[in-house]
Each structure stands twice: as structure tokens, then as C-alpha cells.
Amino acid sequence: MAQKDSESTLDVQWRLDTLNTNKIFAGCFNFFRKWKVKKNQITLIEKLNTGGTGSLFEIKNECEKRGLPFHFNIITHADYEVSPRNLGGLLKLFTIKAFRMATSSHIFLNDNFLPLGYMKLSDETKVVQLWHGMGSFKKFGGSFETDRAVLKELSAATKNTNHILASSENIRDNYAEAFMAPKEKVICIGCPQVDYFFRKHDIDAWKRELSENTHK
């Protein structure tokens, strides 16, 4: 009996592995595009797991701090896990979250999101790539990838991206190459997560906490 259960699980995993989840998710998104875009709906796509930190969540936290009436639809790395244990998560991703994304006025990314290349976005929807790594310390994306199929998907995804934020004018060319994008799409205004360093912090409290923990 245990062997049959194991074989059944492996069969499900094989079927999941053969699915093109990029195209499936995009297909669901395109179906839900029939509905009207909501100006107060924003989608955050955390394809790279940051544990709820970084530029994506700086935007969310700041909007909530200001009391702005936005509804946030969050798609995490875990939602996109293709495995038998996440069948419920995939179902929710392809239905509820795809619907909310399709009706969002703004979509923010922290990594490449290849389903974007297959999506038919509304003219009312703006897509902004925040990228998780500030600066340009290594080659990535179009500067590094050699798989032609992946490069094709990346190029298509970039065509559906309105803006790519960079931390400095000095890396505009690097970002344009990495995202296979025209330089005009790269906006060098800094990254939201840098705002943390411009806030007032209680340094004395941190020193006391550090001192207490050091002497325990």
C-alpha cells in the first residue's frame, strides 16, 4: 500500500513538472482581463523570497502608514511552488490571485517574472521592476543567461514592463542589458528599501539592547 502511495505521489509530481506554469498562469490572467481594472488594487510579486522585506514591502508599509486606501494582492515564491503539497496554493494562484493581478492598476516585481511575457495587460495597468539587488555587483538576466528559450521569455516580459528602477545613473547600461530593455525604461531614482536608512532610529536603544545581550 505504501509503495502504491509513493508511486501515486511520484506520478503527480511528474505531471506537475511537465506543466508550463508560466503559460498556465498567464492564460488565467488573460481570462480575468475581461474584468475592469481597479485603481486601488496593487499586486506585489515576491518571486525572490525576501521574507516580507525589501522594496516591495517598503511600498506596502508606507502606503499603510499614510492611510492610503489601497488593497494589496501579494504573490509569493511559496505560492508558485510546483509540488503535490502545494496543489491548493497553485489553485488559489491560478484563480483568486490571477484575478486580482489582472484587475490591478499597478504591479510591482522584485525579480524576473516570466509569465508576464505571455500576458495581455490593460493600458490602465503599469508594471514596475524593483529588482531585489541594489546596484550591479554581478551579471544577471540577459547579461548572463545563455538559454535561448529563457532569453525569449525575459525579452517578452520586459516588453510588458513600464519601468525598471535602478539605484544610480552609473548602472543604467548594466540594467538595460540585464533586462534586455531600452535605456529609457531604466529610471535611476533609487530603490524604496533605501528609505530605511533615511529614517530616524533610536540608536541609544539599540546600544542598550546590544550591551544587555552581550553581557548575558
Label each PLM-derived region with a short phrase.
Residues A2-F99, H106, P115:
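N-terminal pre-catalytic "stem/leader" segment of glycosyltransferase-like enzymes
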Residues N73, F108, K126-Q129, H163-L165, ...:
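Hydrophobic/aromatic beta-strand patches that form the interior of the parallel beta-sheet core
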Residues T76-E81, F113, G133-M134, E169-N170:
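Short beta-alpha junction loops
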Residues F57, P84-E153:
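Extended catalytic core of nucleotide-activated donor transferases of GT-like folds
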Residues E7-C28, K138, S143, E153-K216:
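A nucleotide-sugar donor-handling region in carbohydrate enzymes
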Residues G52, F72-I74, V127-W131, F179-K183:
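Tryptophan-centric aromatic hotspots in well-structured domains and transmembrane helices
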Residues K38-K39, P69, S104, E124, ...:
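A general structural motif
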